[in-house]
């Protein structure tokens, strides 16, 4: 009996020791996890203050139609770059008109298209939204782009992108024809041309900076939900009856997206709306911009005239000039901004540019 009692006491002691050890171990893991979460929170809070490392190394790939280069096709040059690329790759494109559709996938960041000048180097195609794709279905707008970029840190310099589909008349269906679609983050464009009619430039998503570019079209020829600055660009309308420059797709007030046109020139034919509320909380600002006498009465359009977007959209102008400038303030819900309210849209901080745009490029 005594031996049984001793055995039971021993088993109880061992069980108690295991119980206490288990709970101590659980407490330790909980403490480590809590500390880890705290550290993660601090890392998240300081994420935007960390120095960007960028790509490692640089490589140049050449393209020429005459065969005196590594590739004859821009797409072939893109395809030669490995997935998950971590080098800065410049694709140097010789003068010529490259008739092809080009896609830069999300797995290939840090690519630059460098042309010999926007008047002599161009990539062009002719798809429309109503055209049929390989699956027998209509392409729809976003798939018509002559060039589509999904990758981050894309750059284009001194090159043009064109959709050669003919311009539609107002009200014609299925004639959307995109020249360029940018869906990647932190993209930079300098000295580029974008040529089309309806929906020329699909500024789809991400932060983008366009400097000294020429953008031509007729209806909503800059559209999407990007967070983009257009600095010292020419926005040229080829509208035959009426047209519109920008249609922004911001859908909720928490989004930081918007189009900021700073120091631009608006030229061409009209009458022309300077902005349309594609999204319920569309956001478009013009500052220090010249307007030809082509702005439509009212200046702005709320898209469908039944969603009360005029109450939620943010359309603003600051220090604009030219014979058409007064018309940009033609509706009560277009805001005449003062410097304080305009400043967030006229500095490159609007696109967090200090972290990824070189000072010489700003």
From Swiss-Prot:
The keyword Signal applies. Substrate binds at residues 141, 176, 276. Glycans are attached at residues 37, 86, 158, 308. The record marks 198 as: Transition state stabilizer. The active site is at residues 199, 220. Residues 1-26 form the signal peptide. Pathway: Glycan metabolism; pectin degradation; 2-dehydro-3-deoxy-D-gluconate from pectin: step 1/5. PANTHER family: ACYL-COA THIOESTER HYDROLASE YBHC-RELATED, PECTINESTERASE 68-RELATED. Acts in the modification of cell walls via demethylesterification of cell wall pectin. This is Probable pectinesterase 68. It comes from Arabidopsis thaliana (Mouse-ear cress). The gene is PME68.
């Amino acid at each position: 009996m005594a031996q049984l009692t001793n055995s039971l006491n021993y088993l109880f002691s061992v069980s108690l020791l295991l119980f206490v050890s288990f709970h101590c171990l659980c407490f330790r893991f909980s403490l480590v996890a809590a500390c880890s979460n705290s550290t993660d929170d601090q890392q998240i809070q300081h994420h935007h203050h960390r120095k960007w490392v960028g790509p490692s190394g640089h490589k140049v790939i050449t393209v020429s139609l005459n065969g005196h280069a590594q590739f004859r096709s821009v797409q072939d040059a893109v395809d030669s770059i490995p997935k998950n690329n971590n080098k800065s790759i410049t694709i140097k494109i010789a003068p010529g008109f490259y008739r092809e559709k080009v896609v830069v996938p999300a797995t290939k960041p840090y690519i630059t298209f460098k042309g010999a000048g926007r008047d002599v180097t161009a990539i062009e195609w002719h798809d429309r939204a109503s055209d049929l794709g390989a699956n027998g279905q209509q392409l729809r707008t976003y798939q018509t782009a002559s060039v589509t970029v999904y990758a981050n840190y894309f750059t284009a310099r001194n090159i043009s992108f064109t959709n050669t589909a003919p311009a539609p008349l107002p009200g014609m269906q299925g004639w959307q024809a995109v020249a360029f679609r940018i869906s990647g983050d932190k993209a930079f464009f300098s000295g580029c041309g974008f040529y089309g009619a309806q929906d020329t430039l699909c500024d789809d998503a991400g932060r983008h900076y366009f400097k000294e570019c020429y953008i031509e079209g007729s209806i909503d020829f800059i559209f999407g939900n990007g967070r983009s600055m257009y600095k010292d660009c020419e926005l040229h309308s080829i509208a035959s009856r009426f047209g519109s420059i920008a249609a922004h797709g911001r859908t909720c007030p928490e989004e930081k997206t918007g189009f900021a046109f700073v120091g631009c020139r608006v030229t061409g034919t009209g009458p022309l709306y300077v902005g349309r509320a594609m999204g319920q909380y569309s956001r478009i600002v013009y500052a220090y911009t010249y307007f030809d006498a082509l702005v439509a009465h009212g200046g702005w359009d709320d898209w469908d005239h039944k969603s009360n977007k005029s109450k939620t959209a943010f359309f603003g102008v600051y220090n604009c000039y030219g014979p058409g400038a007064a018309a940009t303030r033609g509706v009560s819900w277009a805001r005449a901004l003062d410097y304080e309210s305009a400043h967030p849209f006229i500095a490159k901080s609007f696109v967090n540019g200090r972290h990824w745009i070189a000072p010489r490029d700003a």
